[in-house]
């Protein structure tokens, strides 16, 4: 079967830059899904995305669906004809449904008898007849939170649609998509190249669009060009461009034909903390800052223009002119804020509610101060510094800089604290209290900062759960899931000896009578432990491993992690499957036990297999206790793995529930002791 390349381009007005890539990849995925559902063979689907277009190109698309042979079985021959050999109504109805007569039906012999059967070949439809519907469905399935109408049309899309180009090889696929008739026309750049022109063949895309329309339709090509040119220009200035992936993709989504340029700002602005300058350059202007080899901000920046004049000086001057007022504002806010110490802003925190039932930000800082001190004492941090950082933790929220540039909270607190002469550990903690801000983010460096970060997050978790506002479904307005995972990461990765029950109980006490949920401690701890699952799954750890540890509910996160790592290792051992099954069997036997179970008595043992297992269990009980005390759970399970043979021999040769009570009690005691050895690490019976 011959194949052709197929092009579908949807020409629109400017698409939302932060959504462009997601829309384009979803479009390609949907097209691929629809092609598969239609049974159309193809090699691969390529996607293209620029500010005013979404496109897919299907390579090697078959020109028709494959023919299908269908077999439709009818009634049994015995039921298809009456005593006189005439077709019954059942047979005639079935034949009519197949579009044949009963006489035209074939017969199928099986070991259960003979049946009427109709076999036919259904010819596949030409691909041309299916493509409009495929593109229509693919567009309808795009993740568009808010659609719009335009002109007098009833159709809705993310932005108004002006052109639809559908080409299968050299053939135009006629039809209507989103109220627009398909054609060969594509539109070029708004200011460069040809405004619009026609394509003769799908294979001309995207090269002809670049040559005649001055549009680089390939998103990844534009992205690579911007990245490489930006790095070259930064190097030429003796620096390194700060190019974050998210901003790079947003800038890529804003331009059709990227022109990377550099500009500068006055050196006097470098007296302002770099974070504030960078915030406005990246967030407001979509510029890439440049740093020197020592990490200091240079008075230059990179921007990407969508036009490419012979003399770019006017564009450069324009961007310098635009950014200057924003940097001047930052300079003014910084100088104004320095006139008042952070500590002097504490009274203003009393005017800002943290949460109506939980009090003001001043109330929160008092709780953070106290809880940070408690945590510091347990992890070996300086209590005085931790409490001081907790007290000042939210003061920068009352500054002009943070009010205007909200993402600078924390980091501006650090700069202002340094200016005020605060201890360096205190100053750094004001910035690091918000870490980790997102998945994969760095953790607080110092133990003082860890104390404040944990205190802040646990105070929020305890307070919100304490008034009955735990996250429901996907809604999480206080970002409690992120806070819980952040706490776990800090405690585990820093190996801190903290118990969640203890910390949450202390946090609860600091709220006084504000909390209404009597089960707040258990609910917060269970919620936090539940976040382990998402974390470990992302690391590729099996769900049953996590569940085996959760079944024991260890409330020290570092200890929890050690158990998970140990069980994950145990699961790779040859004896793991058999021991997991044995633990299930032991669990079932003990659950049905109707007599008291005491200690093992070797003198009661009768069979050699039960004595061997009893001796092994007693010996291991003594061996593993020091290892459990050290938290070396991997070594514990390695030792217990040696029990496979005596356990197998026990179950092969010993009856547990015998009539003689003393013997039965002793055998149950052997199994109970065995089970408890494993349960000191995890519930191995949960493993699949």
Swiss-Prot record:
The subcellular location is: Cytoplasm
Q: Family assignment?
A: Belongs to the class-II aminoacyl-tRNA synthetase family.
**UniProt keyword annotations, A-Z:** Aminoacyl-tRNA synthetase, ATP-binding, Cytoplasm, Ligase, Nucleotide-binding, Protein biosynthesis
One example of the protein's molecular function in GO is: arginine-tRNA ligase activity
Subunit details? Tetramer of two alpha and two beta subunits.
Q: Which HAMAP family match?
A: Gly_tRNA_synth_beta
User: Which terms does the UniProt entry file under GO BP?
Assistant: arginyl-tRNA aminoacylation; glycyl-tRNA aminoacylation
* Entries under InterPro entries matching the protein: DALR_anticod-bd (IPR008909), Gly-tRNA-synth_bsu (IPR015944), Gly-tRNA-synth_heterodimer (IPR006194)
* Protein name, entry field: Glycine--tRNA ligase beta subunit
| This protein's record includes keyword Ligase | yes
Please name the top-level EC class of this enzyme: ligase
Catalyses which reaction? tRNA(Gly) + glycine + ATP = glycyl-tRNA(Gly) + AMP + diphosphate
Has the keyword Membrane been applied to this entry? no
Determine the domain of life of the protein's source.
Bacteria
Any Pfam family matching the protein: DALR_1
The protein's organism comes out as Histophilus somni (strain 2336)
User: What EC number(s) has UniProt assigned to this enzyme?
Assistant: 6.1.1.14
Q: Name one GO cellular component term.
A: cytosol
């Amino acid at each position: 079967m011959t194949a052709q390349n197929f092009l579908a381009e949807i020409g629109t007005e400017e698409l939302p830059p932060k959504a462009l890539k997601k829309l384009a990849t979803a479009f390609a995925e949907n097209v691929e899904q629809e092609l598969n559902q239609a049974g159309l063979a193809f090699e691969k689907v390529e996607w293209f995305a620029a500010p005013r277009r979404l496109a897919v190109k299907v390579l090697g698309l078959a020109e028709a669906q494959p023919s299908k042979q269908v077999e439709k079985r009818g009634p049994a021959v015995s039921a298809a004809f009456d005593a006189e050999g005439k077709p019954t109504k059942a047979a005639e109805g079935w034949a009519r449904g197949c579009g044949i007569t009963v006489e035209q039906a074939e017969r199928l012999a099986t070991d259960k008898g003979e049946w009427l059967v109709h076999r036919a070949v259904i010819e596949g439809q030409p691909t041309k007849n299916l493509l409009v519907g495929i593109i229509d469905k693919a567009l309808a399935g795009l993740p568009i939170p808010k659609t719009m109408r335009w002109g007098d049309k009833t159709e809705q899309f993310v932005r108004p649609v002006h052109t639809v180009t559908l080409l299968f090889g050299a053939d135009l696929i006629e039809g209507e998509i989103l109220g627009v008739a398909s054609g060969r026309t594509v539109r070029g750049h708004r200011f460069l190249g040809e405004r619009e022109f026609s394509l003769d063949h799908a294979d001309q895309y995207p090269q002809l669009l670049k040559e005649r329309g001055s549009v680089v339709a390939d998103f990844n090509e534009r992205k690579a060009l911007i990245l490489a040119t930006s790095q070259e220009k930064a190097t030429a200035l003796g620096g390194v461009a700060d190019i974050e992936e998210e901003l790079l993709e947003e800038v890529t989504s804003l331009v059709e034909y990227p022109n990377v340029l550099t500009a500068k700002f006055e050196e006097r602005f470098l007296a302002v903390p770099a974070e504030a300058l960078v915030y406005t350059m990246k967030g407001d202007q979509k510029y890439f800052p440049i740093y020197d080899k020592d990490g200091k901000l240079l008075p230059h920046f990179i921007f990407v223009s969508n036009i490419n004049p012979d003399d770019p000086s006017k564009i450069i001057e324009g961007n310098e002119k635009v950014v200057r007022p924003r940097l001047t504002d930052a300079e003014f806010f910084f100088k104004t804020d320095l006139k008042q110490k952070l500590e002097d802003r504490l009274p203003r925190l009393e005017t800002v509610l943290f949460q109506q039932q939980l009090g003001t930000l001043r109330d929160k800082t008092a709780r953070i101060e106290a809880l940070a001190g408690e945590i510091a004492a347990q992890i070996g941090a300086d209590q005085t510094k931790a409490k001081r950082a907790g007290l000042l933790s939210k003061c920068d929220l009352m500054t002009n800089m943070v009010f205007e540039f909200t993402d600078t909270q924390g980091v501006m607190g650090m700069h202002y604290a340094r200016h005020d002469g605060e201890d360096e550990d205190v100053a750094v903690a004001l910035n690091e209290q918000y870490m980790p801000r997102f998945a994969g983010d760095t953790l607080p460096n110092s133990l003082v900062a860890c104390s404040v970060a944990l205190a802040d997050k646990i105070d929020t978790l305890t307070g919100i759960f304490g008034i009955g506002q735990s996250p429901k479904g996907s809604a999480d307005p206080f970002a409690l899931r992120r806070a819980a995972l952040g706490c776990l990461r800090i405690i585990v990765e820093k190996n801190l000896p903290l118990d969640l029950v203890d910390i949450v109980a202390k946090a609860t006490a600091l709220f006084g009578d504000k909390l209404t949920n009597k089960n707040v401690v258990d609910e917060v701890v269970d919620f936090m432990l539940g976040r382990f699952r998402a974390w470990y799954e992302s690391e590729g750890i099996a769900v049953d491993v996590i569940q085996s540890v959760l079944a024991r509910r260890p409330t020290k996160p570092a200890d929890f992690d050690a158990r998970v790592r140990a069980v994950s290792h145990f699961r790779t051992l040859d004896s793991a499957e058999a021991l997991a099954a044995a633990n299930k069997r032991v669990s079932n036997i003990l659950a049905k036990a109707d007599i008291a179970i005491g200690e093992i008595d070797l003198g009661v043992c009768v069979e050699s297999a039960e004595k061997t297992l009893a001796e092994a269990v007693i010996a291991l009980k003594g061996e593993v206790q020091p290892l459990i005390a050290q938290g070396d759970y991997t070594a514990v399970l390695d030792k217990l793995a040696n029990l496979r043979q005596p356990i197998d021999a026990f179950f092969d040769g010993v009856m547990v529930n015998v009539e003689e009570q003393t013997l039965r009690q002793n055998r149950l005691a052997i199994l109970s002791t065995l089970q408890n050895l494993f349960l000191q690490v995890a519930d191995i019976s949960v493993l699949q």
